[in-house]
Amino acid sequence: MNNATFNYTNVNPISHIRGSVIITICVSFIVILTVFGYIAKIFIKNNCTNNDIGLRERIKCSGCEPFCNKRDDISSPRTGVDIPSFILPGLNLSESTPN
């Protein structure tokens, strides 16, 4: 009646290491993208002033062009990395407002 016991000594260590490496690479990639996106937003925000945009955009966005969060404005591309809410809950770096 001892057939239900599992023997974990036969687990292939190569496959275990391979899985750990894949997970580490994925997590590192997400962290690197987040850091680079955040740094890019800081540099862009420091380099733009209210004089860089016209009256129409100032009324529409009330700030620098790259940070315009209106969906109908296609003249100002957004920069940075959008982090899905299920990966980092409570951390909003994308500055997007839900409609």
Curated annotation (Swiss-Prot):
Virion surface side: 1-18
Membrane topology of this protein: Single-pass type III membrane protein
UniProt topological domain (Intravirion) ranges: 41-99
Transmembrane segments: 19-40
InterPro entries listed in its UniProt record: InfluenzaB_glycoprotein_NB
GO cellular component: host cell membrane; membrane; virion membrane
One BP annotation, GO: proton transmembrane transport
Keyword Electron transport: no
Compartment(s) of residence: Virion membrane
Glycosylation site list: N3, N7
Superkingdom, taxonomy of origin: Viruses
GO MF, one annotated term: channel activity
The entry's keywords: Glycoprotein, Hydrogen ion transport, Ion channel, Ion transport, Membrane, Signal-anchor, Transmembrane, Transmembrane helix, Transport, Viral ion channel, Virion
Family statement drawn from the similarity comment of this UniProt entry: Belongs to the influenza viruses type B glycoprotein NB family.
Entry function: Putative viral proton channel. May play a role in virus entry.
Subunit description: Dimer.
Full protein name: Glycoprotein NB
Organism: Influenza B virus (strain B/Memphis/3/1989)
